[in-house]
């Protein structure tokens, strides 16, 4: 898949939650929470500022991030679900 996000948008592939709890209990799909972690797949050029400059994004392709549960838009391509987020929707970089 080839996708190029615009401005300060970032495409993230959600990382699925574990199917087994730390205590060994199998978690059914109906009880799983939506993932709030993902891997950055593509990054836009940056946010245009009022003075004409562009603020370069803080995240890079390949980094793992945490984002808000209801942030962004969902996009499905070739059977894979992606999230398209604004850079401000990303809460932290993992690792």
UniProtKB/Swiss-Prot annotation:
Coiled coil segments of this chain: none
Q: What InterPro entries does the record point to?
A: Chaperonin_GroES, Chaperonin_GroES_sf, Chaprnonin_Cpn10_CS, GroES-like_sf
Q: Which Gene3D superfamilies match?
A: GroES chaperonin
Give GO MF terms, alphabetically: ATP binding; metal ion binding; protein folding chaperone; protein-folding chaperone binding; unfolded protein binding
Q: Which HAMAP family match?
A: CH10 (MF_00580)
Show the NCBIfam families listed in the entry.
Answer: PRK00364.1-2, PRK00364.2-2, PRK00364.2-4
State the UniProt keywords alphabetically.
Answer: Chaperone, Cytoplasm
Protein name in the entry: Co-chaperonin GroES
Subcellular location per UniProt equals: Cytoplasm
Q: Which GO terms describe its biological process?
A: chaperone cofactor-dependent protein refolding
Function, please? Together with the chaperonin GroEL, plays an essential role in assisting protein folding. The GroEL-GroES system forms a nano-cage that allows encapsulation of the non-native substrate proteins and provides a physical environment optimized to promote and accelerate protein folding. GroES binds to the apical surface of the GroEL ring, thereby capping the opening of the GroEL channel.
* Binding partners and assembly: Heptamer of 7 subunits arranged in a ring. Interacts with the chaperonin GroEL.
What gene does the UniProt entry assign to this protein? groES
């Amino acid at each position: 898949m080839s996708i190029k996000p615009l401005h300060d948008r970032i495409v993230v592939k959600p990382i699925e939650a574990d199917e087994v709890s730390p205590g060994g209990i199998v978690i059914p799909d109906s009880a799983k929470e939506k993932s709030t972690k993902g891997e950055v797949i593509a990054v836009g050029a940056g946010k245009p500022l009022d003075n004409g400059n562009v603020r370069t994004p803080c995240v890079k392709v390949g980094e793992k991030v945490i984002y808000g549960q209801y942030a962004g838009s969902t996009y499905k391509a070739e059977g894979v679900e992606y999230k398209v987020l604004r850079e401000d929707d990303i809460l932290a970089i993992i690792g």
